[in-house]
């Protein structure tokens, strides 16, 4: 009589388990503990008895778990599976969902509420704006997000990227009267922070972006580093608009506000022009 974990080669092959006392084939969940190699939780198909080697939903416990592709044993902790990171809770093996603290890495991360895969980059989740490190998944705080944005802006000084061209290639609207807003968009985009500019809207028209923030009560005369500075100059084309120019605030020293913008045929750093209104992205909300 066969007992223990056995491989059956017929019908494309499968691993099964026969009870070490009765010899009866196991179905459903089973905790094995008959030798050092086979100790832990396993799952066997309810009909065929085939050992699971993948994600399985355990209806009776209302949880998703993962069984190793080689051993079939239920897994716990962090695992890299099918090009993504997952976390299985230490006691139950249930896949983590939502915002989760990883003590081993001393970091907050976020697992998608549907797939349970770790999220990287910018994301709007439950109405809140987040940025997760592209490599580690660690959640950035407000200052880290602003530092990432302003560092990217400084890295573009005296460069000549085709900001309108990249914006157009990404499906954005182009303003034919200048690249200032396309440059602001390009800073956010190249830093991976697209969602922090009008929730990911793609338009090179300054007034589109200004109106978006103003309608949400996010515009004031008080500047902060990481803000978007807007002006309405006397351009004839902008007569009916509330903004015709934009730049990014990178320093605030008392009343001296420093911006980086695309002006005079170059990307430069300079003191803010008079009469600015400052839009405040949702860095911490």
Show the residue positions of the predicted features:
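N-terminal capping segments
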Residues: 140-199, 242
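A short, hydrophobic/aromatic-rich structural module that often spans a beta strand
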Residues: 66, 209-214, 277-284
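...with weaker cross-activation on analogous glycine-rich loops/strands in unrelated enzymes
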Residues: 194-266
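Extracellular adhesion/carbohydrate-binding repeat motifs centered on closely spaced tryptophans
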Residues: 1-144
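Aromatic- and glycine-rich peptidoglycan recognition patches
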Residues: 97, 138, 144, 151, ...
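Glycine-rich, flexible loop segments associated with nucleotide phosphate handling
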Residues: 38-41, 174-177, 241-247
């Amino acid at each position: 009589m066969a007992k223990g974990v056995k491989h059956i080669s017929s019908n494309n092959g499968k691993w099964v388990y026969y009870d070490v006392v009765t010899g009866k084939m196991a179905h459903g969940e089973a905790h094995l503990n008959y030798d050092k190699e086979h100790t832990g939780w396993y799952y066997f198909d309810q009909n065929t008895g085939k050992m699971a080697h993948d994600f399985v939903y355990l209806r009776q416990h209302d949880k998703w778990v993962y069984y190793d592709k080689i051993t079939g044993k239920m897994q716990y902790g962090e695992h890299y599976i099918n090009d993504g990171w997952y976390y299985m809770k230490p006691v139950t093996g249930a896949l983590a969902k939502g915002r989760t603290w990883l003590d081993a890495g001393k970091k907050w991360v976020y697992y998608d509420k549907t797939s349970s895969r770790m999220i990287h980059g910018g994301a709007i989740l439950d109405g809140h704006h987040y940025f997760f490190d592209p490599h580690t998944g660690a959640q950035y705080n407000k200052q880290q997000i602003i530092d990432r944005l302003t560092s990217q802006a400084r890295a573009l000084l005296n460069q000549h990227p085709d900001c309108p061209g990249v914006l157009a290639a990404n499906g954005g609207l182009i303003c034919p009267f200048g690249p200032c807003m396309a440059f602001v968009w390009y800073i956010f985009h190249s830093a991976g922070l697209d969602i922090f500019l009008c929730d990911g809207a793609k338009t090179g028209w300054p007034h589109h972006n200004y109106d978006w923030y103003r309608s949400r009560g996010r515009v004031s005369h008080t500047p902060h580093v990481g803000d978007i500075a807007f002006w309405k100059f006397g351009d004839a084309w902008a007569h009916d608009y509330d903004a015709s120019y934009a730049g990014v605030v990178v320093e605030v020293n008392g009343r001296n506000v420093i911006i980086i913008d695309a002006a005079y045929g170059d990307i430069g750093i300079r003191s803010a022009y008079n009469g600015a209104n400052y839009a405040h992205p949702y860095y911490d909300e």
